[in-house]
């Protein structure tokens, strides 16, 4: 065949059908979510083997989980009362495609926004609680996220409650521009008022916690916990390396690296978080 000769058409084969002994058979399909590839050991893991906590049985890699899954793992059954629902996200900059992206994400996740806020008990200890969900536009911080978390702190001050926040974020939401950035100062001011009231604020850093969330309320907790191998940082690794013109350590911006350098108080396995949080709340006058 010459270099520019037209190739013969390929025969198209249906991958879900098989012919054996002249009989056309339908091949059973494997469900898409039956297995998960572990980012840690790179192995294909049977979903059921991950368990409720979503931890790799081979290398103990901690998978990302949704806000609902986090609630099921952390709070006492039936104790969670959600607050500040129905706050609508706007498009202050008329950013193209933003509202469509929000609508698609809401339908896919079943969430109204990237954070779930409310009040619950953890092993009998009552607390105000916020859980960020990376499935919602990478839990980016926009005006509604800022408003819900600020209102949670204000509610906690009124009710004299501690605050526990599970952070996870790619940073400020670019579609909202400066309106998203101002949430850093807004939430930080609420954290300060809560602290002035003599109340405990505890953060749990989960993968990933980056950008403006790291630069504000994520690192302002009286006690800062983190899940193993959590990515924690402000700017990205490549940006930092290009700025300082140095090669960074392999574990740079990992929870273990930050604990070694004094930025994280303790690294706690996901299966032990509820007990650890409850113990800390009880030490600091938690409400029964």
Protein language model features and the residues they cover:
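Short cysteine-rich clusters marking metal-coordination/redox-active sites
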Residues: 38-41, 56-59
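Short, intrinsically disordered, charge-biased short linear motifs at domain edges
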Residues: 22-29, 40-47
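Long, charge-rich boundary regions
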Residues: 67-139
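N-terminal alpha-helical interaction blocks
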Residues: 1-24
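Conserved catalytic cores of soluble enzyme domains
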Residues: 170-288
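Cleft-lining beta-strand/loop regions that shape enzyme active-site pockets
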Residues: 116, 121-195, 202
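Short Cys/His-rich "knuckle" micro-motifs
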Residues: 47-51, 64-70
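Residues immediately within or flanking Cys/His clusters that coordinate Zn2+
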Residues: 35, 53
């Amino acid at each position: 065949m010459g270099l520019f000769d037209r190739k013969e058409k390929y025969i198209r084969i249906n991958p879900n059908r098989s012919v054996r002994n002249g009989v056309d058979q339908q091949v059973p399909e494997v469900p898409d979510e039956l297995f998960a590839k572990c980012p840690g050991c790179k192995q294909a893991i049977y979903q059921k083997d991950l368990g409720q906590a979503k931890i790799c049985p081979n290398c103990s890699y901690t998978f990302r989980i949704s806000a609902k899954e986090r609630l099921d793992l952390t709070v006492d059954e039936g104790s969670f009362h959600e607050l500040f629902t129905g706050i609508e996200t706007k498009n202050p900059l008329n950013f193209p495609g933003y509202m469509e992206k929000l609508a698609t994400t809401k339908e896919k996740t079943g969430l109204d926004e990237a954070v779930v806020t409310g009040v619950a008990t953890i092993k009998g200890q009552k607390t105000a609680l916020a859980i960020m969900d990376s499935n919602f536009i990478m839990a980016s911080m926009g005006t509604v996220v800022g408003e819900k978390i600020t209102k949670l702190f204000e509610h906690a001050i009124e009710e004299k409650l501690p605050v526990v926040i599970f952070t996870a974020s790619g940073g400020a939401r670019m579609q909202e521009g400066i309106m998203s950035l101002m949430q850093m100062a807004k939430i930080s001011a609420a954290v300060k008022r809560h602290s002035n009231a003599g109340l405990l604020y505890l953060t749990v850093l989960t993968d990933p916690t980056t950008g403006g969330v790291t630069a504000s309320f994520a690192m302002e907790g009286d006690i800062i916990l983190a899940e193993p191998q959590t990515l924690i940082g402000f700017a990205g690794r490549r940006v930092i390396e290009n700025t300082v013109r140095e090669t960074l350590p392999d574990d740079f911006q990992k929870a273990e690296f930050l604990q070694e350098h004094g930025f994280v108080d303790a690294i706690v396995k996901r299966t032990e978080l509820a007990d650890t949080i409850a113990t800390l709340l009880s030490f600091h006058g938690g409400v029964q």
